[in-house]
């Protein structure tokens, strides 16, 4: 099934260039010199190791769980049932919905959090979001949002609500929990 074709001599590719990589003596294998996320640029023919894992879409149950030793940046949303755990920061450019997010440093949500009383956000540093609705949040330091609705928040230092609305409505909040 199929046609047999004559082999054609290929062209050797030049070795890849990049930061934080070493070329194995076989000149085919590349080894990272540090922990991180591998970035291959086909146009520049380079390979780099970055401390930030950039996810260019949404994280959800179909995408799979994310466990990373550095910082995780999600360019989309974090959907229901998703799990993200990072030793650095977790930065979400969209919103978080009923997910489990933990960070060794800060959690920053450019959009907001609507957890529908499911999931949690936990950070050894601070938690910063546009809004927190029906969320469970544990922060080793401060929590800042424009408004907080019916959420359970524990902050190591302080809870700040800012912006023109600056509302806290319902829920349980505790600050200075270090």
Protein language model features and the residues they cover:
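Charge-rich, low-hydrophobicity low-complexity segments
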Residues: 1-155, 167-178
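Phosphate-interacting basic helix/loop segments used at nucleotide- and nucleic-acid interfaces
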Residues: 159
């Amino acid at each position: 099934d199929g046609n047999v074709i004559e082999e054609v001599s290929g062209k050797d590719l030049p070795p890849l260039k990049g930061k934080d990589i070493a070329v194995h003596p076989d000149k085919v294998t590349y080894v990272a010199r540090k922990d991180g996320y591998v970035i291959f640029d086909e146009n520049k023919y380079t390979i780099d190791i970055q401390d930030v894992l950039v996810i260019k879409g949404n994280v959800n149950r179909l995408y799979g769980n994310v466990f990373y030793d550095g910082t995780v940046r999600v360019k989309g949303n974090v959907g229901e049932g998703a799990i993200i755990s990072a030793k650095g920061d977790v930065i979400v450019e969209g919103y978080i919905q009923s997910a489990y997010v933990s960070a060794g440093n800060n959690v920053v949500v450019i959009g907001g959090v609507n957890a529908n009383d499911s999931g949690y956000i936990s950070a050894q540093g601070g938690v910063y979001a546009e809004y927190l609705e029906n969320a469970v949040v544990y922060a080793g330091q401060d929590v800042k949002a424009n408004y907080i609705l019916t959420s359970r928040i524990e902050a190591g230092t302080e809870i700040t609500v800012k912006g023109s609305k600056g509302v806290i409505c319902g829920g349980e909040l505790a600050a200075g929990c270090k």
